[in-house]
Amino acid sequence: AFINVYGYNTVLGMSDDELSLNIVKCWNEFVMLTEKQSVGLVMDPLAAEERKGRNIFSYFMPSSAKKFTVAFLYPKSPDTSDWIYAHDLGRNYLEETFPDQMKTICVNDVTEERTEQVLNDVIRQGADIIFEVAPQMMKDSLKVAVDHPDVKILNCSLNTSHKYIRTYYARMYEAKFLSGMIAGALAENDRIAYIADYPIYGMIANINAFALGASFTNPRARIYLAWSTSENYDRERFLKDNNIQVVSDQDMITPRDPGRQFGLYECSEDGRKLNLVMPLWNWGVFYEKMIQSILAGSYQSEENSEGRALNYWWGMSAGVIDLICSKNVPTGVKRLVDHLKSDIKKGDIVPFYGEIRAQDGTLKNKKDKAMKPEAIMEMDWLTDNVIGEIPTMGELRAEARPVVQIKGVEEKMK
């Protein structure tokens, strides 16, 4: 763990005093890795007393105090990536919500090689909290986190065991389940396309939840899976070869390419695309509640006695995931989806419930049982109504591999 934090060459150059000091700094990381403890999942925000009544910042910051600084590190720019664009909308939401109490800074095009330098730069600029929106930044963040324990660094990824960096994600599979229900109801030939990007933790749950939702409204539905990051990906050929009209594509538009190929849509014979549903990552709500949690002390109190790494995995109940239906969705289908969305928010139903089988027929979940969150997070298999497979590293384009090397589904990436 020590060499992982500081690097082999740096460790060789340390004096005895520096070695002793730095070993103490990263001791908790060493203990966590040697004991192979599981990730502690935080499924919903903790309710804070201070949120009731006065603005929470008034409890901690007098009017004369300097602004709280929150930094965002992006691997690309918002105008070229729908993922970064969604997070940047969240950053803007923070500034609009708390204009007098905090400010944000963002850095675009942060490569893995530049991560440590950029982190130190934003800390020198006064960053109190840092959100990294890509898993490939994790490795080079660990040393900075150990050296600056007063700065809170969070990385947007799932299933990562580090003491000094917490991770966060959102339960998009809840919205995908509902989107799948709509797709199943509208697919006249029972064929539905699901276009995924990276085979990483969380993505497989999204695919499987969509497939289960489709079978809920159409037991004959089959989900044809394609990967946009694979070497031979060709969307139009894939849809034509498989005679597919109903498609689940990327979740959002990007400013540079504001087309209609996002969310769930239907392709007409004349080539037009009829938008049906848009799953929504509401990162503004997530960032607002996370900062409130930190300032209210909940963030610190979540450090449990077991010392496990913490991963925030919030969903519809927290308001960080939603589903927007267009007027093109039939009224009866929309009414059913709205009812089930309300039930998911209340926790009355969960997408992964009852008997679930993988493509090879293996029983993955028993009848009358809800699947445990850890099992959902670590999925490395596809449900029996999915046609396609999880790609290997060699089948991916070169630019996609760094992300997958860090957070790829392990069974296929070995």
Identify what each model region corresponds to.
Residues 2-50, 297-414:
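Segments of small-molecule ligand-sensing domains
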Residues 91, 178-221, 225, 305-328:
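An alpha-beta-alpha
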Residues 169-190, 281-300:
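Hydrophobic alpha-helical segments within soluble ligand-binding/sensing domains
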Residues 69-90, 94-98, 105-112, 135, ...:
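Extracytoplasmic "Venus flytrap"
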